Amino acid sequence: METVQLRNPPRRQLKKLDEDSLTKQPEEVFDVLEKLGEGSYGSVYKAIHKETGQIVAIKQVPVESDLQEIIKEISIMQQCDSPHVVKYYGSYFKNTDLWIVMEYCGAGSVSDIIRLRNKTLTEDEIATILQSTLKGLEYLHFMRKIHRDIKAGNILLNTEGHAKLADFGVAGQLTDTMAKRNTVIGTPFWMAPEVIQEIGYNCVADIWSLGITAIEMAEGKPPYADIHPMRAIFMIPTNPPPTFRKPELWSDSFMDFVKQCLVKSPEQRATATQLLQHPFVKSAKGVSILRDLINEAMDVKLKRQEAQQREVDQEEEENSEEDELDSGTMVRAAGDEMGTVRVASSMSDGANTMIEHDDTLPSQLGTMVINTEDEEEEGTMKRRDETMQPARPSFLEYFEQKEKENQINSFGKSVPGPLQNSSDWKVPQDGDYEFLKSWTVEDLQKRLLALDPMMEQEIEEIRQKYQSKRQPILDAIEAKKRRQQNF
């Protein structure tokens, strides 16, 4: 579909919506074509600008969402004018929704492409994407902005292969008097150590996330993706920097690039400008090398949409016959409307990178989670109110909620007597686990699920002990900062 757009370009380029367009109802200015998925705070749709024929993306955000965060996202996009950052065209209020009109990137995110093709990327493809991404980061950092959620799901490609940074739902602005931020924000597996530790961070936090993203593009998932996210949060600051699972598969130049990104000390970590001069990036090929993988991904997507549409048509045909019998008012299901929304669900796997264990890296952690029937309201993790307890990072609340849901789902069923209460089970001494051989697979799986709440309790106790020692130090630092004129 998008290749046709290349052959029939818009009548003129849309740069910004004029005052006349902004005073109209959005339906008078745009035709909404289909739902693309979920971004931070709202649903994202593909639409066409009637006057120019240009395809755009529209994020529809419910007004009851965190308006401060939405306004901040718009503000950051408004200030950006770079070919490597998704453009902002304007916004509307429509009923209870805010419509944010943005640049459309027809090939989707890098993680979409990996998942659709069921293949990771080559070094040449990674180098080309990293070069554009670094140019976008260099621009943002020059503007004193931190993206704070760099990952393959937030790097979008247009149909020509140009990479652009997207989803500023958690981005932050640095001022001269606030050289470092102290909020924990982002997606856990990509977080820099200093972000997790809440010791203050600056623009190079994005560089750590970029290094993790490079591994993600090469291996299909970030380091620690196979373990519980809360364990990863404790491991990232304490363990040595992660590296490739099979280093022998990758060139010295690529491994050195990742090594320079994943330096634990932010003061010694390379900047975007410095990394643009790295041999791995300087030798990157043109965007034309990405066209084959983009076309392949779009072909897969189209075939899935066609297959899904056939299923929808068949369901509607069957349902319409039942509706005619059941009710005189519902003669027939609205075929066109159903088709538009349901087609998008052909990507219902989620827009994250290809992950073998979905329960380890849930789709909610990825920006642009493609529309699924049971995950309609989930997107990138949102930043919580900074006035809340600083000792309780926002991602902990998220994971605790997921644990509660898992426990309700798992333990609502009949469980054998010995497994009813996880706290009743004591860990065997001296590693004597022979008795487990007599258990059924079902009992073993239930026991494994029961271990998670025990682990959470132990982690919480450690966190509280750590916080009791850490908080006085943080208070002293904050007091000194307040006495300083400039940081």
Swiss-Prot record:
<dbReference type="GO" id="GO:0043065">
    <property type="term" value="P:positive regulation of apoptotic process"/>
</dbReference>
<feature type="site" description="Cleavage; by caspase-3">
    <location>
        <begin position="326"/>
        <end position="327"/>
    </location>
</feature>
<feature type="modified residue" description="N-acetylmethionine">
    <location>
        <position position="1"/>
    </location>
</feature>
<dbReference type="GO" id="GO:0035329">
    <property type="term" value="P:hippo signaling"/>
</dbReference>
<dbReference type="InterPro" id="IPR036674">
    <property type="entry name" value="p53_tetramer_sf"/>
</dbReference>
<keyword id="KW-0963">Cytoplasm</keyword>
<dbReference type="InterPro" id="IPR000719">
    <property type="entry name" value="Prot_kinase_dom"/>
</dbReference>
<feature type="modified residue" description="Phosphoserine">
    <location>
        <position position="414"/>
    </location>
</feature>
<dbReference type="GO" id="GO:0005524">
    <property type="term" value="F:ATP binding"/>
</dbReference>
<dbReference type="GO" id="GO:0006915">
    <property type="term" value="P:apoptotic process"/>
</dbReference>
<keyword id="KW-0547">Nucleotide-binding</keyword>
<dbReference type="InterPro" id="IPR011524">
    <property type="entry name" value="SARAH_dom"/>
</dbReference>
<keyword id="KW-0723">Serine/threonine-protein kinase</keyword>
<dbReference type="GO" id="GO:0005737">
    <property type="term" value="C:cytoplasm"/>
</dbReference>
<dbReference type="GO" id="GO:0004674">
    <property type="term" value="F:protein serine/threonine kinase activity"/>
</dbReference>
<dbReference type="Pfam" id="PF00069">
    <property type="entry name" value="Pkinase"/>
</dbReference>
<feature type="coiled-coil region">
    <location>
        <begin position="289"/>
        <end position="327"/>
    </location>
</feature>
<feature type="modified residue" description="Phosphoserine">
    <location>
        <position position="265"/>
    </location>
</feature>
<keyword id="KW-0175">Coiled coil</keyword>
<keyword id="KW-0808">Transferase</keyword>
<feature type="modified residue" description="Phosphotyrosine">
    <location>
        <position position="433"/>
    </location>
</feature>
<dbReference type="GO" id="GO:0051262">
    <property type="term" value="P:protein tetramerization"/>
</dbReference>
<feature type="modified residue" description="Phosphothreonine">
    <location>
        <position position="367"/>
    </location>
</feature>
<feature type="compositionally biased region" description="Acidic residues">
    <location>
        <begin position="313"/>
        <end position="326"/>
    </location>
</feature>
<feature type="modified residue" description="Phosphoserine">
    <location>
        <position position="410"/>
    </location>
</feature>
<keyword id="KW-0460">Magnesium</keyword>
<comment type="similarity">
    <text>Belongs to the protein kinase superfamily. STE Ser/Thr protein kinase family. STE20 subfamily.</text>
</comment>
<keyword id="KW-0007">Acetylation</keyword>
<dbReference type="GO" id="GO:0090090">
    <property type="term" value="P:negative regulation of canonical Wnt signaling pathway"/>
</dbReference>
<dbReference type="GO" id="GO:0106310">
    <property type="term" value="F:protein serine kinase activity"/>
</dbReference>
<comment type="function">
    <text>Stress-activated, pro-apoptotic kinase which, following caspase-cleavage, enters the nucleus and induces chromatin condensation followed by internucleosomal DNA fragmentation. Key component of the Hippo signaling pathway which plays a pivotal role in organ size control and tumor suppression by restricting proliferation and promoting apoptosis.</text>
</comment>
<feature type="domain" description="SARAH">
    <location>
        <begin position="433"/>
        <end position="480"/>
    </location>
</feature>
<dbReference type="GO" id="GO:0043408">
    <property type="term" value="P:regulation of MAPK cascade"/>
</dbReference>
<dbReference type="GO" id="GO:0005634">
    <property type="term" value="C:nucleus"/>
</dbReference>
<dbReference type="InterPro" id="IPR011009">
    <property type="entry name" value="Kinase-like_dom_sf"/>
</dbReference>
<dbReference type="GO" id="GO:0035556">
    <property type="term" value="P:intracellular signal transduction"/>
</dbReference>
<comment type="subunit">
    <text>Homodimer; mediated via the coiled-coil region. Interacts with NORE1, which inhibits autoactivation. Interacts with and stabilizes SAV1. Interacts with RASSF1. Interacts with FOXO3. Interacts with RASSF2 (via SARAH domain). Interacts with AR, PKB/AKT1, TNNI3 and SIRT1. Interacts with DLG5 (via PDZ domain 3). Interacts with MARK3 and SCRIB in the presence of DLG5.</text>
</comment>
<dbReference type="InterPro" id="IPR050629">
    <property type="entry name" value="STE20/SPS1-PAK"/>
</dbReference>
<keyword id="KW-0067">ATP-binding</keyword>
<feature type="domain" description="Protein kinase">
    <location>
        <begin position="30"/>
        <end position="281"/>
    </location>
</feature>
<dbReference type="GO" id="GO:0046872">
    <property type="term" value="F:metal ion binding"/>
</dbReference>
<feature type="modified residue" description="Phosphothreonine; by PKB/AKT1">
    <location>
        <position position="387"/>
    </location>
</feature>
